[in-house]
């Protein structure tokens, strides 16, 4: 298959999330786990970006002046907080329904986000570039992980960062993130994740490094049921995040 024919889109995944689009901003609905997950990933992104670009993470708008791409933005759960922190945000998603929900919510919240129903490859082909690219809980839903990572890496400006968050392909992840989360605890609709589409860290890092990126940080993330919150961890066997930087 030629590279021009490659696509990152898995239409069945787009359809699955389009069908749930109306629930994006319901903290007790089908996206409840993402609402729970948002604080730890927002803090991690803010702190890493602030450290990298020499910003004060505790200031009101530490991302002011930075252009940020939230790829696979869904209803905007990350895009809106990024914009509130001062970033110039492009929220991109392959689902027109998701983008419609995101635009409506942003308008009602008074937050400015440039939402687009567009693919990563279309943005890259248009020559778009960003200081920060966010791939959060997306790679396990795309059709071609290597192509997706390469495409997104090309949009990171020199001196810029990419964040990736996903679920590891391990038996532990299958037990906790799929069986328990979807079938026992019912945190997610059944079928949200498929084991063979989960991605190991090395499968992300190889195409990033081949695209000239350098791995800057890695962290696991785990859910503490006693505190009812997500925390960073050294254990990357289930949920994890990777930060890559493009040298100047």
Curated annotation (Swiss-Prot):
It comes from Rhizobium meliloti (strain 1021) (Ensifer meliloti). GO terms for biological process: methylation. Pfam families: Methyltransf_23. S-adenosyl-L-methionine binds at residues 41, 72, 93, 136. O-methyltransferase that catalyzes the 2 O-methylation steps in the ubiquinone biosynthetic pathway. Coiled coil: none annotated. CDD domains: AdoMet_MTases. The gene is ubiG. Pathway: Cofactor biosynthesis; ubiquinone biosynthesis. The keyword Iron does not apply. GO terms for molecular function: 2-polyprenyl-6-hydroxyphenol methylase activity; 3-demethylubiquinol 3-O-methyltransferase activity; polyprenyldihydroxybenzoate methyltransferase activity. This is Ubiquinone biosynthesis O-methyltransferase. It catalyses: a 3-demethylubiquinol + S-adenosyl-L-methionine = a ubiquinol + S-adenosyl-L-homocysteine + H(+); a 3-(all-trans-polyprenyl)benzene-1,2-diol + S-adenosyl-L-methionine = a 2-methoxy-6-(all-trans-polyprenyl)phenol + S-adenosyl-L-homocysteine + H(+). Keywords: Methyltransferase, S-adenosyl-L-methionine, Transferase, Ubiquinone biosynthesis. It is an enzyme of class 2 (transferase). HAMAP family: UbiG. Belongs to the methyltransferase superfamily. UbiG/COQ3 family. The lineage of its organism: Bacteria, Pseudomonadati, Pseudomonadota, Alphaproteobacteria, Hyphomicrobiales.
